Amino acid sequence: MMMMGEGAHAPPWQQHVASPVSGVEGGGGRESEVVAAPYHLLDTLRHYLPSNEAAAAEDEEEAAAVAAAVDAYACDEFRMYEFKVRRCARGRSHDWTECPFAHPGEKARRRDPRRYCYSGTACPDFRKGGCKRGDACEFAHGVFECWLHPARYRTQPCKDGTACRRRVCFFAHTPDQLRVLPPSQQQGSNSPRGCGGGGAGAAASPLAESYDGSPLRRQAFESYLTKSIMSSSPTSTLVSPPRSPPSESPPLSPDAAGALRRGAWAGVGSPVNDVHVSLRQLRLGSPRSAPSCASFLPAGYQYGSPKSPAAAAAAALYSLPSTPTRLSPVTVTTASGATVTVEPLDLGLIEEEQPMERVESGRALREKVFERLSKEATVSTDAAAAAAGVAPDVGWVSDLIN
């Protein structure tokens, strides 16, 4: 008797599954049987392959380089002293325009302002095509050297403000970014002697406080002017001043002299000071000679102008009466017929007096002269009258004095 199921035999099911890895269809049998794995599991396994470690390292280095470049663009110290100054370690294997470092043969290369003495002024020869002095030139070569110089970088506001989208901007976008230079660095900003050393601390120039208009020079000049005004009192204006200014007198450049003539400083330029300055320029050869108009006028002053307040004061000074240089003999005849001849008065005593008294008050001088004449005439006539027994007539002397 035949058992159920023994006579029928079903063939095995042939699985034709395409391998997701090789893409080749497998045949029958156990070797051809491949279990289909999900694709997300294969993607997860790929991260552990040895070939992916080098790529990951390159990605990390590139990201770090980009982050460093971004930080470098935002730092003022880096831009002034390192941007296009430090040589790049990667060489030519990347885009130079995206790199903040210097490369061989790059036109944007800068000289280190801490090593080379050059100002922030553009070199005219470099603009024309080339400078023969090279790195020894005292002026800036190129836009980066000019505007990234420590004396010029972010010393002016940007016209676009916070809306500026430049990768490297030379100007300040906010008041906090605006750099204020010390006076010593401001003095040397446009001069080749003003070497940029803001990061390391530039030494102050010994001439920083001696330029025209500095507080020290102005104070010295005001002190000198005050002393000159005090010495220009009415009792000493005709005393001949020294040929050269005193030692405390500060030297003045043409610009400072022009500022003095324009009255740029406080207390200078007023009519009174103009008169004092003109009086300080007096050059009188002899106290007996009348003052000359040319000797009163210093260089650069135009007293001929009718609008000048000092012209009127100078004209009034020139119009004062002058002292006669020689006196003729005086003959006096009394009522009794006696004749008395008086010799010219010795002017040696008058020269010892203050010269300003002779110029300032001619009437007082005449009174003194006639007073002495009257005394001498009185002595002579008294002797003659005593001999003749007649009283002298001195009424004419009183008329002259009055």
Swiss-Prot record:
* SMART domains documented for this protein: ZnF_C3H1
Q: List compositional bias (Low complexity) regions by residue number.
A: 232-241
Keywords, in A-Z order = DNA-binding, Metal-binding, Repeat, Zinc, Zinc-finger
The reply on keyword Manganese is no
The molecular function terms of the Gene Ontology recorded here are:
DNA binding; zinc ion binding
InterPro entries per record: Unkempt-like, Znf_CCCH
Which Pfam families does UniProt cross-reference here? Answer: zf-CCCH, zf-CCCH_AtC3H23
Taxonomically, the superkingdom here is Eukaryota
Q: Compositional bias (Pro residues) spans?
A: 242-253
For this protein, the record's Gene3D superfamilies field holds: 3.30.1370.210
From the UniProt entry, list the residue stretches annotated as the region Disordered.
180-211, 232-258
Ranges annotated as C3H1-type zinc finger: 117-144, 152-176
Compositional bias of type Polar residues: which residue ranges? Answer: 183-192
The record, for PANTHER family, names: UNKEMPT FAMILY MEMBER, ZINC FINGER CCCH DOMAIN-CONTAINING PROTEIN 35
Q: What is this protein called?
A: Zinc finger CCCH domain-containing protein 35
Q: What is the lineage of its organism?
A: Eukaryota, Viridiplantae, Streptophyta, Embryophyta, Tracheophyta
